[in-house]
């Protein structure tokens, strides 16, 4: 092959470049849309694959599908580098018109399509938009873009856009669906003093059209006056702020003026030298006003307003002054309240500042101790009156009965022995242990040892057996007795004497409470007996008598004698008072007192052998029969009589060392090595007990020989006839013979007539006792002497606590 000539090389190169350019022609990416205004024109728009000069490279040809129509050409224009728009003119567009479209790039057909204008309608944009202000409203108007004869004139709807000129995002859209191209906008709906712009566009909804382009915009300035309703909240808020500012400014101004001007004015009330006058002594020392009664302090702002505006606050101040006066005066207090009180400030007196006065003065009246006066009254009379007693009886039947009983006992005891005086003080109550039985004697050498208690029937009541050491026994502390009771003080003189069984049986409760002995001494248990600490405070004379007997250490003894022992005791004392004058009267008193003592020893639970009419008699000095079983000596009171053991073989029946049947251990004065020594307290109490024992001793002894009075009688058919003798019957007329022991002198006669035959059935019947329940009385002797009535020792024994029948003397 040959080579090309150098002259042909340039033309070949140009042909290759042209072919390459032809093969790389432009392409249409997509046909955007074709719309018709439905009047005279239609618009088509498409996008090229690369930037293209639409008017130089492209052309659009369109032709109505009709044989007689011409082929028309449209030169496109560039909207953008790659977007081309072509406007096609059409005459008398109708709904049935259809056009054929062809896009050419030179001789190359890019695309072809058909287009029906009635189905692709895009109305024209409204024109001539204007804004008018009418009565606080804005009227927007525009013109319809279609003539009246066009089909779209009545098919258009509008959309109005109102926005702030400076802020396009703040806008409002109004949809106008009616035919009239107008819009009314209320000025209040828009912000005042703001510039707004409006624009409008149209659409033919029935033709399936799209929104037209926005019309040219119009602007206006929104300025209007707000109505009163809208201006009122703002005005109120502004007014409140102004008023608050004025008040604060006035307050601080007044405070500043007060500090700089008002406080500088001299005022005597601010002076520290103020004398306080103290009055109204009826106010209590501790009676301070409560918070509710204290007058409220006036706040500072009120004080300032009062000084500045006195006329406005005058009425309120008067009410406060009246209320403060009422609180200060207070209610009237009765004279029964405390006499000493503190003093309260009622007035202030202004003094010159030169004078120095104390800022406060308190006047108090000291309380007078009334206890010193009571002590002085007690020194004058040992029996305090009921008025001075803090716990006296209440006025009423109980108080009257207590005072009558007091006067009766004082009269009876005074008639018996005028040397008793008025002393009725009780023994000290503060001692830790009080002896249960007090031994009275003239000196420490004559103190008698206490007896031992033995059961009446050891087989039937083994728990009642007592074991006692040879020394003196220690007993429980006596229950506390209120010593401030006037009736009890009156009884204390007589209660200091040994009590007889008749007096003990006058109160059934007394017999029950006599069972409270020392826990160290074994005795029969009494489950129904309440503890001594739980006993109520004595209020009646019977209860006080019971408490006194408990203090004296009386042993328990079951008794169920009827009430009325007080009357029997009073009768006995009256009869005993005549013993000093004549023998028969003394014997009658002795027998009545014996019947009283016999009646007090009745036991309701006794059964078995029936006693005879003489078994319930009073046998104070009768020794036990040799043939009879050893009785259990359960003595109650010995009335201060000195008793010696009988010098007979019967003493061997009652050995003192037998643990099964302990009995009395008779000894002679000065021979008992186990005799306990009396303490100073017991020696002091013995002097007082001598006074009480002298009453009974004078009633039961003969004034001629100093021996006991005896009653001789005989029993006939169960009845005891008593014959009283004017003397003791054993040594009357024989003054030279020394007095023998009462026990020896009162041994039972050989005839077998017991001493208790002198006890009449009448006296037993008066106490409500039957012959079947007449117990025997036994006596427990104690060493001592009976040389004179002024030195009569007092021996108090213990009662058996068993449920069997007991007898006391």
Curated annotation (Swiss-Prot):
UniProt motif (Box 1 motif) ranges: 261-269
Cytoplasmic side: 256-809
Topology term for the membrane: Single-pass type I membrane protein
Complex and partners: The functional IL4 receptor is formed by initial binding of IL4 to IL4R. Subsequent recruitment to the complex of the common gamma chain, in immune cells, creates a type I receptor and, in non-immune cells, of IL13RA1 forms a type II receptor. IL4R can also interact with the IL13/IL13RA1 complex to form a similar type II receptor. Interacts with PIK3C3. Interacts with the SH2-containing phosphatases, PTPN6/SHIP1, PTPN11/SHIP2 and INPP5D/SHIP. Interacts with JAK1 through a Box 1-containing region; inhibited by SOCS5. Interacts with SOCS5; inhibits IL4 signaling. Interacts with JAK3.
Written domain comment of the UniProt record: The WSXWS motif appears to be necessary for proper protein folding and thereby efficient intracellular transport and cell-surface receptor binding. The box 1 motif is required for JAK interaction and/or activation.
Protein family: Belongs to the type I cytokine receptor family. Type 4 subfamily.
Protein's recorded name: Interleukin-4 receptor subunit alpha
């Amino acid at each position: 092959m040959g080579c090309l000539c150098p002259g042909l090389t340039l033309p070949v190169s140009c042909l290759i470049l042209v072919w390459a350019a032809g093969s790389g022609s432009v392409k249409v990416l997509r046909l955007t849309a074709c719309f018709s205004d439905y009047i005279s024109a239609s618009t088509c728009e498409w996008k090229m694959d690369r930037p293209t000069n639409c008017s130089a490279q492209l052309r659009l040809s369109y032709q109505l599908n009709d044989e007689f129509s011409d082929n028309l050409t449209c030169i496109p224009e560039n909207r953008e580098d790659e977007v081309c728009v072509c406007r096609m003119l059409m005459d008398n567009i109708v709904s049935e018109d259809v056009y054929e479209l062809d896009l050419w790039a030179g001789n190359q057909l890019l695309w072809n399509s058909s287009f029906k204008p009635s189905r692709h309608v895009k109305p024209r944009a409204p024109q001539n938009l204007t804004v008018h202000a009418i009565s606080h409203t804005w009227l927007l108007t525009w013109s319809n873009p279609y003539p009246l004869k066009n089909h779209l004139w009545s098919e258009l709807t509008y959309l109005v856009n109102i926005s702030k000129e400076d802020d396009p995002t703040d806008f409002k859209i109004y949809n106008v669906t009616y035919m009239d191209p107008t819009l009314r906008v209320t000025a209040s709906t828009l912000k005042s003093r703001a510039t707004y712009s409006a624009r409008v566009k149209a659409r033919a909804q029935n033709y399936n059209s799209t929104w037209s382009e926005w019309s040219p915009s119009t602007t206006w300035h929104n300025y209007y006056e707000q109505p009163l309703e809208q201006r009122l909240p703002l005005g109120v808020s502004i007014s409140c702020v102004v008023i608050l500012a004025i008040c604060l400014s006035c307050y601080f101004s007044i405070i500043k003026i007060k500090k700089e001007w008002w406080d500088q004015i001299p005022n005597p009330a601010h002076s520290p030298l103020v004398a306080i006058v103290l009055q109204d002594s009826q106010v209590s020392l501790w009676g301070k006003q409560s918070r509710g009664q204290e007058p409220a302090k006036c706040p500072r702002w009120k004080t300032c307003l009062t000084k500045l505006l006195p006329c406005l606050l005058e009425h309120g101040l008067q009410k406060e002054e009246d209320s403060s006066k009422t609180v200060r005066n207070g209610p009237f207090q009765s004279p029964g309240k405390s006499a000493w009180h503190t003093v309260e400030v009622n007035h202030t007196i202004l003094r010159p500042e030169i004078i120095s006065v104390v800022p406060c003065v308190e006047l108090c009246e000291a309380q007078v101790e009334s206890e010193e006066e009571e002590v002085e009254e007690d020194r004058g009379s040992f029996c305090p009156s009921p008025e001075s007693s803090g716990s006296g009886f209440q006025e009423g039947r109980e108080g009257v009965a207590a005072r009558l009983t007091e006067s009766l006992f004082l009269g009876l005891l005074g008639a018996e022995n005028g040397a008793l005086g008025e002393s009725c003080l009780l023994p000290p109550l503060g001692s830790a242990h009080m002896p249960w039985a007090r031994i009275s004697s003239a000196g420490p050498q004559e103190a008698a040892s206490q007896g031992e208690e033995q059961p009446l029937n050891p087989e039937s009541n083994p728990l009642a057996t007592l074991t006692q050491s040879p020394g003196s026994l220690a007993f429980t502390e006596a229950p506390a007795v209120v010593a401030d009771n006037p009736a009890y003080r009156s009884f204390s003189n007589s209660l200091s004497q040994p009590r007889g069984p008749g007096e003990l049986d006058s109160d059934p409760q007394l017999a029950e409470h006599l069972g409270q002995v020392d826990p160290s001494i074994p005795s029969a248990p009494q489950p129904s007996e309440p503890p001594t600490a739980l006993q109520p405070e004595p209020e009646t004379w019977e209860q006080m008598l019971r408490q006194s007997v408990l203090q004296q250490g009386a042993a328990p003894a079951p008794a169920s004698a009827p009430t009325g022992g007080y009357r029997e005791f009073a009768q006995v004392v009256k009869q005993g008072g005549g013993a000093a004058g004549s023998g028969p009267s003394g014997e009658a008193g002795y027998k009545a007192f014996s019947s009283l003592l016999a009646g007090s020893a009745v036991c309701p639970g006794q059964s078995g052998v029936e006693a005879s009419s003489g078994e319930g008699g009073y046998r104070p000095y009768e020794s036990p029969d040799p043939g009879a079983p050893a009785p259990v000596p359960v003595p109650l009171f010995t009335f201060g009589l000195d008793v010696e053991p009988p010098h007979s073989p019967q003493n061997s029946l009652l050995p003192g060392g037998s643990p099964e049947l302990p009995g009395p251990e008779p000894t002679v004065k000065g021979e008992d090595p186990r005799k306990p020594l009396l303490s100073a307290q017991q020696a002091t109490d013995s002097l007082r007990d001598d006074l009480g024992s002298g009453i009974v001793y004078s009633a039961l002894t003969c004034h001629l020989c100093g021996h006991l009075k005896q009653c001789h009688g005989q029993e006939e058919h169960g009845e005891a006839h008593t014959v009283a003798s004017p003397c003791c019957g054993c040594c009357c007329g024989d003054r030279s013979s020394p007095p023998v022991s009462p026990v020896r002198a009162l041994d039972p006669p050989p005839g077998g007539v017991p001493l208790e035959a002198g006890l009449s059935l009448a006296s037993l019947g008066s106490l409500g006792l039957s012959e079947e329940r007449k117990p025997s009385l036994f006596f427990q002797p104690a060493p001592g002497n009976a040389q004179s009535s002024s030195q009569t020792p007092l021996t108090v024994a213990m009662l058996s606590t068993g449920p069997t029948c007991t007898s006391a003397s």
